Amino acid sequence: MAETTEFELVSPERLLFSEPVEMVVVPGTDGDFGAMPRHAPLLSTVRPGVISTYNGGKVQRRIFVAGGFAEVTEDRCTVLADEAFDLASLSEEAVRARLQAADDRLKEATSEAEKAEAAQAKAIAEALLAARKG
């Protein structure tokens, strides 16, 4: 049996899941990185993108995160995600509705802060749609 590391995904509301994995690939701000058992300690910011977990040499789960932070130790990888979506259970219609809502907010925004927030929401929705298709 292959050696595993514990992967935890945490949202602001709750622990989304915790499971043993052979490897997890995280979209770090400076590039994707893989965490495996006995990994050197690492802290990283996480950009919007897809986290992939591996077991048996195959992708087990793909989760889109909207950003956050990751901590890797020799026996654990914890991602604190701003938002997280399991791509296997997310419909394209739901993603398109999210993108449309973000686009509408951007068109209606009046202050610079509203525009920046709406633009970020739209960029995340576009990345989520691309991840859902890919």
From Swiss-Prot:
Primary subcellular site in the record, as a coarse category: membrane
> Which CDD domains does its entry note?
F1-ATPase_delta (cd12152)
Its placement in the membrane is given as:
Peripheral membrane protein
Q: Which GO terms describe its molecular function?
A: ATP binding; proton-transporting ATP synthase activity, rotational mechanism
Give the Pfam families listed for this entry.
ATP-synt_DE_N
The subcellular localization recorded is: Cell inner membrane
Q: Which UniProt keywords apply?
A: ATP synthesis, Cell inner membrane, Cell membrane, CF(1), Hydrogen ion transport, Ion transport, Membrane, Transport
The terms describing its cellular component in GO are:
plasma membrane; proton-transporting ATP synthase complex
Please report which protein family the annotation says this sequence is part of: Belongs to the ATPase epsilon chain family.
Q: Which HAMAP family match?
A: ATP_synth_epsil_bac
**Complexes and interactors:** F-type ATPases have 2 components, CF(1) - the catalytic core - and CF(0) - the membrane proton channel. CF(1) has five subunits: alpha(3), beta(3), gamma(1), delta(1), epsilon(1). CF(0) has three main subunits: a, b and c.
**What is the role of this chain?**
Produces ATP from ADP in the presence of a proton gradient across the membrane.
What protein name applies here? Answer: ATP synthase epsilon chain
Species of origin: Rhodospirillum rubrum (strain ATCC 11170 / ATH 1.1.1 / DSM 467 / LMG 4362 / NCIMB 8255 / S1)
Gene, per the UniProt record: atpC
